[in-house]
Regions:
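N-terminal pre-domain segments of enzymes
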Residues: 21-56
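Bacterial Sec-dependent N-terminal signal peptides
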Residues: 1-22
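Surface beta-strand/loop "capping" patches
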Residues: 209-239
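Accessory beta-strand-rich segments of carbohydrate-active enzymes
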Residues: 66-68, 97-215, 238-240, 245, ...
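Short, solvent-exposed beta-strand/turn "edge" segments of beta-rich domains on protein surfaces
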Residues: 53-54, 98-102, 221-224
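Aromatic sugar-binding surface patches on proteins
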Residues: 150-152, 263-271
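Predominantly extracellular/luminal regions of secreted and cell-surface proteins
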Residues: 61-84
């Protein structure tokens, strides 16, 4: 089976230190992949393969963490290190602690923005965080999100430091079966068929530079009966003059193409 690639354009010493700070929590059964975890290079693959950009920065790794009373202030001192993106209850997080509905989990880390990204908008992406999330950059609240399974992102450009390092803080509340959210079989007291809760960041966190006008999402629909591929590019801001171009490649060979304006989907006839 051939793999087809779609290209779109919008016209307008750490490893040693990390290993010393982290080890799996508890005496849990481990797979061969768990044995291979490197805290300085956790899940290094690009986290959004359906819409991949060349420039990005992975923020997975060791973060500071603290467990606080719900509604409490961000602490000045943190309890230790947690390996993102593993849930705080898990062994691979290096923490292995349970959190109740009267507590919140706070994360902190610093990051630098590559100088080559100057003049770009900087997006902060979360693959998934369970459940209610609040995010600050340099003490500026950049956004909130509710939901444990869906990705979300914030434009953090206005909050970034003009020079030097930036401070990222994430606060999470997850009441599990004592709240209103969908939770599957997660319960506060797991037994029988019920599961241990998953709290906090559990998918990749990353930074991405984009232009002022950019593609936010793609909706790709194949029609096998008619040999058509429909591509809907959702832009951060629509304008009638925006031109979206779709190129379909078989390896390095261009096999189909199409264009649209006015926010219309592109229908590409496939060979």
């Amino acid at each position: 089976m051939k793999k087809l690639f779609i290209a779109l354009s919008l016209v307008t010493f750490f490893s040693l230190e990390s290993s010393a700070q982290w080890k799996p929590a508890g005496d849990k059964i481990k797979t061969e992949w768990a044995e291979q975890i490197d805290p300085s290079n956790v899940l290094p693959e690009y986290p959004r393969p359906i819409m991949q950009r060349n420039d990005w920065k992975n923020l997975n790794g060791l973060w500071d963490y603290a467990i606080i009373d719900k509604g409490g202030h961000i602490p000045a001192d943190f309890e230790g290190k947690i390996l993102v993106p593993f849930a705080v209850e898990s062994s691979l997080s290096g923490v292995g602690k349970r959190i109740n509905e009267k507590q919140e989990l706070v994360y902190q880390r610093s990051f630098d923005v590559p100088s080559a990204w100057k003049g770009k908008q900087i997006l902060l992406h979360f693959g998934a965080v369970d459940w209610k999330t609040d995010v600050w950059v340099n003490d500026v609240k950049v956004g909130s999100h509710i939901g444990g399974f869906t990705p979300f992102s914030f434009d953090i450009t206005p909050a970034l430091s003009a020079r030097g390092s930036n401070r990222l803080v994430v606060k999470v509340w997850d009441p599990t079966d004592r709240g209103p959210q969908p939770r599957g079989k997660q319960v506060s007291r797991p037994e029988g068929i019920w599961y241990t809760p998953v709290t906090g960041i559990w998918q990749t966190v990353w930074l991405e530079p984009v232009s002022g006008k950019h593609i936010e999402n793609l909706r790709i629909t194949p029609d096998i009966d008619r040999n058509l591929l429909t591509v809907k590019a959702e832009l951060n801001a629509n304008c009638a003059t925006d031109l979206v171009e779709v190129n379909v490649y078989d390896g390095n060979q261009l096999v189909a193409a199409g264009k649209s304006i006015n926010g219309e989907a592109v229908e590409v006839a496939m060979p």
